[in-house]
Amino acid sequence: MLTKDGESYVSLKQDICFSIPSICSADLAARCGLDAFPENAIQLNARIEVLKRLREVQRQVEVAVVGLSRQLHSIYETLRSKDPSQWTEVTASEVANMIHKNPTAIEIYAIHKLLMDNPMRFLASNQYAANQTFRIRPMNEVKDLEQVQQWVREKSPALDRFISKAREVADVQVKLRESSREDQPSYVKGEHLWSETDKTIIRLCVASLGHQRSIQLNPYLALVGHIIRHFYDMRTVKHDDHEIHRLLMDIGVFTPWEDLLAIDAGYRLDLDTRLAVVQERDQAILRALENSKEIKPRHPEDFYPVDPLESIRHDWGNLAVYVVDDVGAEELDDGFSVERIESEPGSMWLHVHIADPGSVIPPTHFLAQNAAQQAESWYTVPRTFPLFPKSLVHHPVHGLSLGIRSKNGIPDRVLTFSAKLDSAGNIVDYAVRAGLVRNVNRISYDSVDVALQIPSPLFEYPFGGAPISKASPAPSDFVEDLKAIREIALKQRERRIAMNWLAFNRNRAEVKRVSEFPSPPNGIVGAQIDTPHLNKGFPNLVYIVSSTRESGDVGFRSVVAEMMKLSCRVAARFFTDRNVPAPYRTGQPLIPTSEKAIEKLLSKRDELGYIQEAEGLTDFIYEPRAQYQLNPGMHFGLAIPEGEGYVRVTSPLRRYNDLVAHWQIHKVLLNEKEGKTSKDGVKGMFDKAWMHNYINTLEIQSQTLKGIQRRHNRYWALNYINNWQQTFKDGKNRHLWPRDPQGNPIPDPLEGLEGYTISGLISNQLVQQVQLNMVIPKLGLQPIVEDVVADLDVGVVLGTKITVNLKDIRLGMKANMITTIDSSRMKWPPS
């Protein structure tokens, strides 16, 4: 990147927030070169020309911003939510159109700069680079910021009074926590009361934990840093996020089992667990189900009064449908059947039956709109945030989860994706139909593994607590069908490996709850400010380390995954053959360092196509992430060739984009029944322009949710380890130390840590240290290695084995494990 001052440096793609393509041509940009300094006269002259243009743009922007600055307050007052506690959103272009009739790129950029420079009121969204959307801070939060700023500036005694009281509360809370290590989590009514001044400071501390991109200044940093320094008598504060989280736990506002990501207001999850509120919502849904009369619903509370596809549903009669999932699964989206073809030995039809929420919920319903915003069900450690309410999903008559209606003598509505497969596992024909299934059989993955005598996935439990499998085999009359289905899956795997497919085997940590978490005293998940409480105990959790290979290609779980892939390929053919727009999921192959590197990688594959990550890091540059697009394309990760396509349709109860595809199929099936076709294909519910816009939104949501899931998994893994450390610190509570099946104490999982590097040496200017990123397979985590003594010019080969000691666990919104190199167990720097 070339700056207006002539400096050149590398920038992350996601940190580039605004582009004006017309400033210079691609040719002029190319002539500037990529080096930090110009290497010849051509590069120098090109850079001089670009700098002239940049400075002219800068001059125009400065003039525009001066005029806009005076309007900042009125812009905020006009756009903020009228509810002083709620966030709202606006794009830079929308603000520009409020002020200018036909805003130029310079005027839009001036708005972008003005709002970006005012984080107290305007916060750049997580995917700002893609949508230029700002979140507008609620008025209450702005007032809290302004008030605490004033108190800090004036050295108000209000802060001293709060810190004095907070220390007294923390003394009680910390002692209570230490004395209740064996207890189940619970709330204890506090004897303290927070004043209105205290509440202002606490609200500010809570709000400071909201996720914010580093591309903007953080208006909370100086304020919470001041509070932390005085509360903990620190001279300097380097990790505000971690320390403010610690403070809020120490004074009982947060519990150690609070899920910081879920309570972030930016994600708009339903945090109200009050029984009366939940019951009223459920009753409203049930009333709407009974009262909806419009065949074409228009009101946001109207469901379909009758099934839109009732006249064209294929009745599958007594055909056995197998729904295989985890024992505790709540939303059962999919089941499958096999139909042998007597006249064609080796060939068979696979029918994948998917729950059909589109038969009840129209796109206009408020539940659909809420689902569009949430994007998918959230499975957090403390609780599940379903895409649709349980009262609807499990309703005995209108229920959407497979098996609910048929259990009550009413056939389940499904969309069935059928693939005719030859003896080699190739799709030679397909069909997509609306259907009715009656013979739904729910069984668990483990019971099928036992019945078929195949290995189940092997997961590691480094902190103990491995469950003892008690699964009984699936009924014997299911076995032949289940074997046939597994044979289909094995052929798909063979096909994939023959296409030179490969994947890296990586370990990943996951924490699961063993028992339910307590409900918050006020019934609303999040900070307990108005009703002061303390807390004790810690949830019963289990720490699991799974590998990509075991979770993806071992046991009947992998068979079900292959069936879902086949149905998504069928869906793609359905849309492609009819020229109907759909959200195709694609993924390009990894980028190798050379042609020889490809051969090297392929030679390292095991029988399932996997390579241990540490063995392949030096042979590829990067793995392109999966994307959505309007046309069918390659998906290397699923071994789908260019042009075939893949459209997700198998989880409409858990993913909104699958439901979008279902609605599209509904309309196509109805139009085909009525003969409404044209030379351009069959029309769906959504046209190409709508689908294009939706795919842009879906792409943003997909990347955001992946990031959230990574942070969530890391936070809970580190929270678990932090609690483990505190429980057994200084030899305490040894009677609680887990034991193996033979009754012996398990080895200390935090001793003898080793792994491999996944980055070169990093000079972190913020903390003035040389660092490394690494993987510890035993824990399934990627910690930071600090205090690295090494020559930056020498570097470290990716995949280098490394031994480390645990230095620190930092929680907060950006949880991290910090390690240091254990030079007693390895030579450092490596030669």
Q: For each of these PLM feature ranges, what is it?
A:
Residues 5-7, 15-225, 231-233, 302-790, ...:
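Electropositive polyanion-binding surfaces
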Residues 12:
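Beta-strand/loop-dominated core regions that host nucleotide or nucleotide-derived cofactor-binding catalytic loops
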Residues 1, 830-831:
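Eukaryotic N-terminal targeting leaders
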Residues 233-320, 324:
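Short glycine- and acidic-rich boundary segments immediately preceding or forming the N-terminal edge
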Residues 786-807, 827-830:
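C-terminal structured domains
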Residues 809-829:
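Internal insertion modules embedded within essential enzymes
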